[in-house]
Amino acid sequence: MTITFRNYRGPEDLDLQNAFWVQATRDLPWCWKPTLSPALYAQGAKFDPRSRCFAFAGDRLVGYMSFTGEGEFVSLGYPWVLPGYEGELQEQLYDAVYDFAASPEYGGKRFAQRFREQWTDQISFFERHGFRAESTGSIYALDLLPAADPQIWVSGEVEVQDKFCWDDFCQVSLGHVTWEQLAVWKQYFETVDFDFAVKARHGASAAGTIGVAIRPDTRFAEMIVVAIAQKATDALVSCLSAAVRHARSRRAKFLGTKPISLDGSVDVLTHMGFKRVSEEFLFSKTI
C-alpha cells in the first residue's frame, strides 16, 4: 500500500501523536510518562507544522517523527513506526523532519535526545546518523509489588502534595545550583506531567522535595526531581519512604530514579531495596 505523508494540522494531531507514542514505547524498559512538551511547543511562537511528520497507509497511522526546540537547540524525536514498517519509512521520516530542523529557515544547530541502554534500536539509529552518546547516569528502581513498606519512621515534617512546587526546589537548591542551571531546570520541569510530590521540612524551610510522574499503562513511577539539602540524609530517607508508600497507594509497580546529588545517596537507595536497572544516554549532534 502506498504511504502518504502530511504535517501537523491541528490540536487533534497531538492526541494522535501521543496515542501512537504510548503504543510504540509500551514495551521499552523504564520508559517515562509522556511529557507535555509537544503541546507546549505547539503553542509557542516558533512552532512550525513541519516539525511533525505523519505517515499513513490508507487511513491508518503507521509512523511519525517530530521535534521540539528553542533557539538553536532541537530535541529531536525518534521515527516511531508500527512493526513491519521499520527501515525505509524511518529514513523518510527522519529526512523530512531533521532536514527541516537543520535548515537555515528553522535554524537548528544543536540536536539531542535521550535513551535508556536497553533501547538498542533507537540507539543504533541515532549512532548511524552521526549522534554521539554520553552517559548521564544510572537508573535505579524499586519493585513495589514484593517490597515491604520501608521500616523507617517518617517524620511528621514530611508531607505528600498533589503538585510539584517549584519554590520548594529553588529553596533546597539555592547555594549549590547556579541561576543559569535553575532556569534550565524550570524549563524542563514545566514539561513534566507530575502526579504527586513529597516535601520535607526543617522548621520553616524546605529540606527536600521529590516530584513523581507515573506512566498509566505500565505503572512505572519515576522520581523526576529529587532535591535534598546538603548533608540532609535524614530528609532523603524520609522523602523516599513517603514516595514509596504513596506510589504504591497509586498502584505503581516500580519506583525509579536517576542519581541523586547527595553524598551517601546510593547507600540509602541500596538499603531501601533499589537496584540499578539501566543507564541513560544523551545523544547529541552539532552542525
Question: Model features per residue range: what roles?
Answer:
Residues 1-36, 137, 147-181:
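Short amphipathic alpha-helix that is part of the acyltransferase structural core
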Residues 11, 25-95, 101, 202-233:
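Conserved donor-binding loop and adjoining core beta-sheet/short helix segment
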Residues 71-73, 110, 137, 218-220, ...:
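A generic structural signal for beta-strand entry/edge sites
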Residues 74, 107-113, 221-224, 251-258:
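Hydrophobic beta-strand segments of well-ordered beta-sheets in folded domains
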Residues 83-86, 94-101, 107-115, 119-127:
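Membrane-interface helix-loop-helix junctions at boundaries between adjacent transmembrane segments
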Residues 92-109, 238-253:
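Conserved acyl-CoA
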Residues 114-151, 242, 250-287:
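Active-site/acyl-donor-binding loops of N-acyltransferases
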Residues 175-246, 253:
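Intrinsically disordered, low-complexity segments enriched in Gly and acidic/Ser/Thr residues
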